[in-house]
Regions:
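N-terminal lobe of the biotin/lipoate ligase/transferase fold
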Residues: 1-113, 249-250, 265-268
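Long, positively charged amphipathic alpha-helical accessory segments at protein N-termini or as interdomain linkers
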Residues: 2, 9-12, 82-114, 124-268
Length: 268
């Protein structure tokens, strides 16, 4: 496989490190940060064999799927840096829309309605197509943030908490290389809108326009406790706001999210 950055990413000064096989692109990126790298660099691999997603779940990416990570060095508080995950979701959704335009025209727009699931997934018809994982670490006088993005291009894992789907199953015939190039360009756009957190208000608006589950029953499981209610919105810090049966608006900072009929079952 030959991965290349998109023209917009190149113009913005991004660099690329590509591998045939690697344990984890996130680990490679964070190791580079510890070595003093200045950031604005992508790590991409044809095959990932020991990756970890959210909550340290295994994240294996076979050849043909896309596994990549971008390293940014920031001078912001950790809580602000965490909101870059919403920019990553928007960038991924935009890249997917671009590369699947031809298939969408054949099948109709509803067949390719990509939706963003809090905090960092991209779904199609309720099935997981993309997972995004954020890692952060203080390095010298900066905060190193790594956004790892995994996309099911040719194959989807089985027996996952959320049913998964691939682009191939949707009829989108695209290579991981072309998708990566589009993603690197759209990252520049949404990273710029986010603007070290100053533009999160606009990111939040765009994210909510593409969000799944708004107004629906939701169950969130985290650290052995569960919360159930209605998904109202996300706040200015990126927390999920849940309207509980007791009438309370509860901010949720992390957890496994289940919607609709799966809310109660998933929260057990």
């Amino acid at each position: 496989m030959t991965f290349t950055l998109g023209p917009r990413a190149i113009s913005a000064g991004y660099r690329l490190e590509a591998f045939e096989q690697v344990g984890s692109t996130n680990l490679e990126a964070m190791a580079r940060a510890r070595e003093g790298d200045r950031g604005s660099i992508w790590f991409v691999t044809a095959e990932q064999i020991a990756g970890k997603g959210r909550r340290q779940r295994p994240w294996i990416s076979p050849r043909g799927n896309l596994a990549c990570s971008v390293l940014e060095l920031l001078n912001v508080a950790p809580a602000v840096a965490a909101t870059i995950g919403f920019a990553a979701g928007l960038a991924t959704e935009a890249a997917l829309r671009k590369v699947s335009l031809e298939a969408a025209l054949r099948a109709g727009p509803e067949a390719f309605k990509y939706e963003l699931k809090w905090p960092n997934d991209v779904l199609v018809a309720g099935k997981k197509l993309v997972g995004i994982s954020l890692d952060a670490e203080a390095v010298d006088n900066h905060l190193a943030i790594v956004a790892g993005i995994g996309i099911n291009v040719v194959a989807a894992p089985e027996e996952t908490p959320t049913p998964a789907i691939s682009l191939a199953a949707l009829g989108v015939q695209i290579g991981a290389e072309e998708l990566f190039s589009a993603l690197s360009d759209s990252w520049v756009e949404f990273r710029g809108i986010w603007d070290n957190g100053r533009g999160f208000g606009q990111i939040r608006k765009l994210w909510l326009e593409r969000a799944t589950g708004l107004g629906r029953t939701v169950g969130i499981k985290s650290a052995g406790s569960t919360v159930e209610g209605t998904f109202e919105t996300i706040d200015e810090q990126g927390c999920m706001i849940v309207h509980t049966p007791a009438g309370r608006l509860m901010p949720i900072t992390a957890g496994d999210v289940y919607f609709g009929s799966a809310a109660s079952a998933g929260a057990v």
